[in-house]
């Protein structure tokens, strides 16, 4: 798992996760805690990195924040996206976006269950980052508690899917989650649902798009990993089938590899590999970013938005909307972003969460 450190705040053991807000369009004002990951500040699409010195926000100075979420089926007949927010004992906010494929079984399961697998070990890692400790026990090349949590969640999901009939048993899903504290933001993602931070005129991508497309460094790394596992890429898809290279579920690329390979061999297909190892994995990229007084908005969305709007355009849209009318709530902004994606003729479901980080500043 790749880890990049920028900073974090504190997480308490035994946090209350008993309630969940997940509705078609909802907003809330709740205390903020934030986590972010990366050894370097993420990509900046509008200015070069390291040009301005970041100012830290005082620890344990939590304030109420505004956030909102909205979704739409778009042109699709079925809604496969899911999203959620949880307030962890007033000390940490958890946001999750899940883009399902092959049905909604996987995304629905992750919305309800993924956080349960991020147990005390994962929270301990988050707590270390929040306190400013190094990740000496969880290095970039070592097993990370969040990676372990995702792995266990994927195993449980595959068992769950195995109890379902066609076609749900073949479903899969992306997952992008963000933990927000007063001083940091932690993101962990699998797939191509994206988290983006607006920071004083700049745009910071807080997640990697896991797609087998060679136009980016991350994409080339995914292609290499797939080939090394015995897989192959055809028409920018894993084995010519799946558009994302990391995902939860998708049994045929994991426990069902032998059957999948046999099916390809029976057709006389050329250029196929051995599928010695799973070419599709649920291993997350984890990033930790330090909060700054320059932070504006956090946007987390499925690719139904990102297919028609890039990261900088989304942040500019949010800023422009708030500049026109500062009384807008984040659920208004999330709804407007989804509507813009639909008007831009997205071909997918669209789900979006917007968090106003300005309201948590001193």
Predicted regions and their residues:
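PP2C/PPM-type serine/threonine phosphatase catalytic domain
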Residues: 1-362
């Amino acid at each position: 798992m790749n880890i990049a450190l920028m900073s974090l705040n504190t997480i308490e053991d035994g946090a209350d996760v008993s309630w969940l807000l997940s509705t078609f369009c909802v907003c809330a004002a709740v205390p903020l805690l934030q986590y972010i990951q990366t050894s370097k500040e993420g990509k900046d699409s509008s200015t070069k990195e390291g040009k301005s010195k970041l100012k830290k926000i005082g620890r344990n100075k939590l304030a109420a924040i505004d956030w909102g979420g909205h979704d739409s089926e778009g042109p699709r007949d079925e809604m496969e996206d899911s999203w959620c927010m949880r307030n962890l004992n007033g000390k940490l906010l958890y946001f999750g976006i899940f883009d399902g494929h092959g049905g909604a079984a996987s995304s629905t399961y992750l919305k309800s269950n993924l956080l349960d697998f991020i147990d005390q070990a994962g929270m301990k890692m988050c707590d270390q980052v929040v306190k400013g400790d190094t990740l000496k026990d969880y290095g970039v090349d070592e097993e990370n508690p969040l990676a372990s949590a995702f792995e266990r969640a994927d195993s449980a999901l595959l068992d769950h899917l195995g109890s379902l009939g066609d076609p749900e048993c073949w479903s899969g899903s992306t997952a992008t989650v963000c933990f927000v504290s007063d001083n940091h933001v932690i993101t962990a993602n699998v797939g191509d649902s994206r988290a983006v931070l607006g920071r004083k005129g700049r745009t910071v991508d807080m997640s990697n798009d896991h797609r087998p497309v060679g136009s980016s460094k991350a994409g080339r790394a995914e292609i290499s990993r797939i080939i090394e596992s015995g897989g192959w890429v055809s028409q920018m898809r894993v084995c010519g089938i799946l558009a994302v290279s990391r995902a939860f579920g998708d049994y045929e690329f994991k426990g069902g590899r032998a059957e999948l390979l046999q099916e390809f061999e029976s057709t006389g297909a050329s250029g196929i590999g051995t599928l010695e190892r799973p070419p599709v994995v649920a291993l997350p990229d984890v990033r930790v970013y330090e909060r700054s007084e320059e932070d504006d908005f956090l946007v987390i969305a499925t690719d139904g938005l990102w297919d028609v709007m890039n990261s900088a355009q989304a942040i500019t849209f949010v800023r422009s909307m708030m500049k026109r009318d500062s009384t807008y709530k984040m659920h208004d902004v999330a709804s407007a972003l989804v509507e813009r994606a639909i008007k831009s003729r997205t071909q997918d479901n669209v789900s979006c969460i917007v968090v106003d980080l300005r309201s948590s500043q001193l």
